[in-house]
Amino acid sequence: MNELTERAERTTTIAEATEHWWIADERIGGAQSDSYSVYTRAGVIFVDPLPLTYAAADRFPAVSFALLTRGCHQRASWRYRFEHGARVLAPRGSWGLLTEPDQHYVEGTRLPADFRAIRTPGPEYDHYALYRPGDANILFVGDLVTRRDSSSPLELSEDTPRLRPGISRDSLASLLDLEFDLLCMSHGGYIDDDPKGALVELYERTA
């Protein structure tokens, strides 16, 4: 989706060197949309970045990269490129981008700060999860797993009609071999209390 007019007024630290911000997104009926930042040796990295107020954005005088899990999560990436120097990385095959990203990626592309791209088709063909190992392993799942807000149950993405039935659930299964301490969704916030258990429960519930 494109950039909103509403901007988040603050960020919250949710793990060491990791921050989160969110808005009630009028484009999707007021459901929660979320973004994250990770401080790394390669600089500050934003994931699916929503707009911040100028006061909140002052926390980030320089942003090295904006990583997108899918093209429609470009959100405020281009503003962060222009104002903060961010390089925008988007999946190859992304559609609807307002301009050309600095780099396209696929599974296996070397990403900054040891981020790993994992192709997870379902919401669309060129959809990715991003895995970042570290003192706390973080899994960003984009739109594969969402919820309306932080108090709502997890939902698995519907399969895009042109993709084979069950592909979203297969993508979810591919993530269950990973070890992670923090699950970050692009809609519905994050889970830091048994995040893998939450995905296992969702997988079993959607059988």
Q: Which residues fall in each region the model found?
A:
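Short, charged, surface-exposed secondary-structure boundary motifs
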Residues: 57, 76-78, 96-104, 149-151
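Pre-active-site segment of Zn-dependent metallo-hydrolases
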Residues: 23-65, 100
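Short acidic-hydrophobic, aromatic-tinged amphipathic segments that line or gate anion-handling sites
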Residues: 102-112
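Metallo-beta-lactamase
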Residues: 2, 6, 13, 18-20, ...
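Active-site metal-binding motif and surrounding structural segment of the metallo-beta-lactamase
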Residues: 51-94
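Short, well-ordered alpha-helix to beta-strand connector turns
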Residues: 63, 84-85, 101-102, 179-180
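Residue-level detector of beta-strand structural context in well-folded domains
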Residues: 12-13, 34-36, 107-109, 128
